From Swiss-Prot:
<dbReference type="InterPro" id="IPR009027">
    <property type="entry name" value="Ribosomal_bL9/RNase_H1_N"/>
</dbReference>
<dbReference type="InterPro" id="IPR036791">
    <property type="entry name" value="Ribosomal_bL9_C_sf"/>
</dbReference>
<dbReference type="GO" id="GO:0019843">
    <property type="term" value="F:rRNA binding"/>
</dbReference>
<dbReference type="InterPro" id="IPR000244">
    <property type="entry name" value="Ribosomal_bL9"/>
</dbReference>
<dbReference type="GO" id="GO:0003735">
    <property type="term" value="F:structural constituent of ribosome"/>
</dbReference>
<dbReference type="InterPro" id="IPR036935">
    <property type="entry name" value="Ribosomal_bL9_N_sf"/>
</dbReference>
<dbReference type="Pfam" id="PF01281">
    <property type="entry name" value="Ribosomal_L9_N"/>
</dbReference>
<dbReference type="Pfam" id="PF03948">
    <property type="entry name" value="Ribosomal_L9_C"/>
</dbReference>
<keyword id="KW-0687">Ribonucleoprotein</keyword>
<protein>
    <recommendedName>
        <fullName>Large ribosomal subunit protein bL9</fullName>
    </recommendedName>
</protein>
<dbReference type="GO" id="GO:1990904">
    <property type="term" value="C:ribonucleoprotein complex"/>
</dbReference>
<keyword id="KW-0689">Ribosomal protein</keyword>
<dbReference type="InterPro" id="IPR020070">
    <property type="entry name" value="Ribosomal_bL9_N"/>
</dbReference>
<comment type="function">
    <text>Binds to the 23S rRNA.</text>
</comment>
<comment type="similarity">
    <text>Belongs to the bacterial ribosomal protein bL9 family.</text>
</comment>
<dbReference type="InterPro" id="IPR020069">
    <property type="entry name" value="Ribosomal_bL9_C"/>
</dbReference>
<keyword id="KW-0694">RNA-binding</keyword>
Amino acid sequence: MEVILIKPVRKLGKIGDILKVADGFGRNYLLPQKLAIRATKSNKELIVKQKYEFEEKDKQVREEVEKINTIIKDQQLVFIRQTSDDCKLFGSVTNKDIADKLSKNISYNISHSNIILDKQIKSTGIYTVEIRLHAELTSIVTVVVARSESEAQDYLREQKAETLEDVDETA
């Protein structure tokens, strides 16, 4: 299937690119998410005319996302959860939990699909989580999972001490 991208897609292309993609990928992801349109003759002519508009709209979105990104990058999200004796959670901290808490903290709606978890969070500790609000822009947020507020503060102190040690070693 041949498609024309109308939004930048990470690892695929930028606005206006004409690509051949698998039929299923095009039908089930790119077209429903309004990331691309079918590459018909009329759409190719239309995209040439509207490419500038799409790029301007993307530029505005990117500027807004950069402002949000400056707020997000300093966030430390603390989750207090019940655990077993060996610090395993009863359940897990999901990307939806992280999105909800982050949205509440910064007063901006963040979708759970923007949260990129390397693996499920199923035990206490400090985790770094990637937030992707734009195809070309990512943020890193610190997530602390603990049994109590005091334990969470201990984790944060340990991390700060380790960071200071790393700085001393490199100096």
